[in-house]
């Protein structure tokens, strides 16, 4: 239980209870993780404002677009302030402004001592955000290390394409 409270997982296609409203869902997740009423209210307000989701929280999730569902899922992953966040393709469905905000949140989380593992096919995002990187081919780790160790003087895309050709 302790480990679960320290982690969050954001799948590439999160299952969100469509019969709930956004605020009901976030309160449900906060209840699961024991987030106090005061902390949850503050965090929901902060993240919903940042993602411009506040006006939509009273609406049923069934009416949300893919992008709104993704924003809600991101907030639900952050609501209990986990130390480790695992994300699978977190930028899919986000508009450019929300994607930029997520990048900022990821950097803030790491700067505050947290860690994030995420998968992406957008190598420029990995190159800009990551301190360490791993390249996986057909389920096997083929290269890993700091960004400098992996890419040297090349771009991450060039390294990836070279490794794919092997």
Describe these PLM feature segments.
Residues 85-89:
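Catalytic Walker B motif of ABC-type/P-loop ATPase nucleotide-binding domains
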Residues 144-145:
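ABC ATPase "signature
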Residues 126-128:
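A short, surface-exposed alpha-helical micro-motif characterized by mixed small hydrophobic
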């Amino acid at each position: 239980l302790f480990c679960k409270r320290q982690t969050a997982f954001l799948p590439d296609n999160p299952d969100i209870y469509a019969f709930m409203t956004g605020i009901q869902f976030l309160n449900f997740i906060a209840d699961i993780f024991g987030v106090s009423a005061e902390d949850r209210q503050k965090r929901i307000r902060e993240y919903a404002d940042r993602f411009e989701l506040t006006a939509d929280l009273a609406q049923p999730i069934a009416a949300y677009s893919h992008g709104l569902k993704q924003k809600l899922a991101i907030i639900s992953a952050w609501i209990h302030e986990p130390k480790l966040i695992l994300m699978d393709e977190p930028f899919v469905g986000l508009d450019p402004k929300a994607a930029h905000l997520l990048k900022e949140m990821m950097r803030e989380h790491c700067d505050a001592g947290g860690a994030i593992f995420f998968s992406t096919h957008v190598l420029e995002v990995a190159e800009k955000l990551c301190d360490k990187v791993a390249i996986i081919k057909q389920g096997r780790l083929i290269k890993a290390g700091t960004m400098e160790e992996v890419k040297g003087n090349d771009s991450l895309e060039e390294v990836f394409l070279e490794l794919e050709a092997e």
